[in-house]
Amino acid sequence: MVAKDYPFYLTVKRANCSLELPPASGPAKDAEEPSNKRVKPLSRVTSLANLIPPVKATPLKRFSQTLQRSISFRSESRPDILAPRPWSRNAAPSSTKRRDSKLWSETFDVCVNQMLTSKEIKRQEAIFELSQGEEDLIEDLKLAKKAYHDPMLKLSIMTEQELNQIFGTLDSLIPLHEELLSQLRDVRKPDGSTEHVGPILVGWLPCLSSYDSYCSNQVAAKALLDHKKQDHRVQDFLQRCLESPFSRKLDLWNFLDIPRSRLVKYPLLLREILRHTPNDNPDQQHLEEAINIIQGIVAEINTKTGESECRYYKERLLYLEEGQKDSLIDSSRVLCCHGELKNNRGVKLHVFLFQEVLVITRAVTHNEQLCYQLYRQPIPVKDLLLEDLQDGEVRLGGSLRGAFSNNERIKNFFRVSFKNGSQSQTHSLQANDTFNKQQWLNCIRQAKETVLCAAGQAGVLDSEGSFLNPTTGSRELQGETKLEQMDQSDSESDCSMDTSEVSLDCERMEQTDSSCGNSRHGESNV
């Protein structure tokens, strides 16, 4: 799972901490204060200051989006007030220090007289990007341990067991990438060029299989970290880190997600090197082999991570009664998507789409853990009817919020319904935006088509491009593309779980469920 330095206070020049004032007349000695004069550390962080050794702060290279979940986090930047912050970085004068560069041609002062073709320069740039990315990754992984793990352990902010759960096998990943970086540097010529990288990659990439345990642990790690943030000591520590320069305005989870982001980027990096490698270069065959290796590893880890995520959420489902348990849930190995939606009363629901069953729940706190209490019966995907509702077609009701919203067009709703004999359900669900709604529609359609195909009831597309269910004769739009894993559905859509509201309504929901007979057919109003 990318992702996305040390002291909590820095020594600074007096000039950086005060407003510019006209020079006062006085002895020259007063005007020329030593440039290394230090200011007193902030009192609120004195307990943390000596725990973290200073390191060089370098910008994190931004990674492209990946095909698995990539949880994005936004941090609000505070405006500077009058004087610049004590830790504000001043641009170094070009005459004394060269600006750090991420480009091979700038780093090694490539001269046009070296007779390199444009394609070869691009190849060297791609190889250097691979090497530089390893260096950045190693630095950030070490930072995560020294700036977060070790201080929290020493200050007893978290227990060792909790930190082991959150950080997983992160320590074991550092030597792997140090080995690759060392090999890449060894084959680099004095002029900065690299002739062959294929054999190195073919020999090194198989060790990335060890990412299996780290990535599979991320769902549980993220959940525990979010839970621990309710502890004011943890929240205070993480907030101070976020406001410190070493963090680059990234929170702890951004750093913990960097290994996964790096893993899924390797195929792109290797393809870029291959694209600029001449056909007669011996490296081409090795690069093609390396791409096949990393694609297989990523696919395998992706599968195992998905299974781990599915198990995690199945273990946190709470059933109000035995009749809600469904063998389709127990047999599911893949969680197609999940996230927060609202019903037509504005009540927050957390919906899970497993391989063959849709489960609508309410988030509750149980034994100090976030769990998901089933609301109504699970809906088999094969019997599920999906309807895309036009904006304004659904009216909010049953609350003050709904009373004042009647004049507005209610947007981003879709409806799922189910009828099997005397059992029936209808739920109008609202996504937070159009994109999120379309993701849900695509994912449900894809899951339904997969189930029907597996049952030998493959639907057909009519002339209008709709999916025709041969069993019911109902017509649905065909999903355009297979949905990416929606592990970021809550974070990217800025939806947070309102556990306080859920806890208050828990008893009311139980009474509602007990009073609802199986033959009752109506909207999912809580």
Swiss-Prot record:
Residues 466-475 have a biased composition (Polar residues). Acts as a guanine nucleotide exchange factor (GEF) for RhoA and RhoB GTPases. It comes from Homo sapiens. Residues 122-304 form the DH domain. GO terms for cellular component: cytosol. Residues 20-40, 464-526 are annotated as: Disordered. Its main location: cytoplasm. The modification Phosphoserine is found at residues 47, 70. SMART domains: PH, RhoGEF. This is Rho guanine nucleotide exchange factor 3. Residues 291-449 form the PH domain. Widely expressed. Highest levels are found in adult brain and skeletal muscle. Lower levels are found in heart and kidney. InterPro entries: DBL_dom_sf, DH_dom, Endocytic_GEF_Adapter, GDS_CDC24_CS, PH-like_dom_sf, PH_domain, PH_RhoGEF3_XPLN, SOS1_NGEF_PH. GO terms for molecular function: guanyl-nucleotide exchange factor activity. The gene is ARHGEF3.
